[in-house]
A protein has these predicted regions:
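A cross-family signal for N-terminal binding/gating loops and helix N-caps
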Residues: 1-214
Length: 214
């Protein structure tokens, strides 16, 4: 397993003494030492957000998933570099249980490196559509985007982290919507109250990182 990929496993995330500091270290390594390679074209990450849900930190805004560490995970908001993730799925939708553990790094912005002038794709859907616009439905996929480590550190201005984009304060309404759209009915009627309290705890966490200060 690639060294950075190993840092996205459940074991590594559970071992982190301070998850906030761990997110910051992952962001720094991604910005400085990784590019997204698509064929002959390189993209620098410019804007990312972190999401992680498990029993001890119920950040319910996180999309549920079953993924290996480092997989691309597509969802209605764009694409994540996934953490190793598990959630039970016994029906059409996932079921929230105490052993659920899932999350990832949302790609919010990328910078296409071009000799004629770099092009910025600012926004998670713009970034996703640029990277994963089209691929052959019948032949082996060529030029599929992948994370590649570079030898020399890339520019990283290390601005202060920010609140994640566009999260709403109305906890009851937001949590109800998330549960209705993404999960089977809760088995524990008290869990919703816990999720609402957790949403209030996490909605303004500074888990958004940018490459540049501007």
């Amino acid at each position: 397993m690639e060294p950075f990929q190993a840092k996205l496993t459940m074991a590594a995330l559970k071992a982190a003494e301070n998850v906030d500091a761990y997110f910051a270290s992952l962001a720094e390594e991604l910005f400085q030492y990784y590019v997204i390679q698509k064929g002959k074209t390189q993209y620098w990450l410019t804007d990312i957000e972190f999401y992680l849900y498990h029993k001890q930190r119920r950040d319910i805004i996180t999309y549920p998933r079953n993924c290996k560490a480092g997989e691309w995970f597509f969802h209605p908001s764009g694409v994540d570099i996934a953490f190793e993730s598990f959630v039970r799925k016994e029906g059409k939708k996932p079921t929230l249980t105490d052993d659920a553990f899932f999350g990832g790094i949302l790609v919010r912005g990328i910078q296409k490196k071009d000799p004629k002038g770099d092009i910025l794709f600012d926004g998670p859907m713009l970034a996703c559509e640029e990277l994963f616009d089209k691929f052959d439905a019948f032949e082996e996929v060529e030029n599929f985007p992948k994370l590649v480590r570079v030898a020399q550190a890339l520019p990283y201005e290390k601005p202060e982290p920010e609140k994640r984009f566009n999260l709403k304060k109305n906890a009851e309404e937001k949590v109800s919507s998330i549960l209705a759209n993404n999960y089977e009915p809760l088995r524990d009627e008290h869990l919703k109250d816990e999720l609402i309290q957790a949403y209030r705890q996490f909605w303004d966490k500074e888990y958004r990182y940018k490459r540049y200060s501007r």
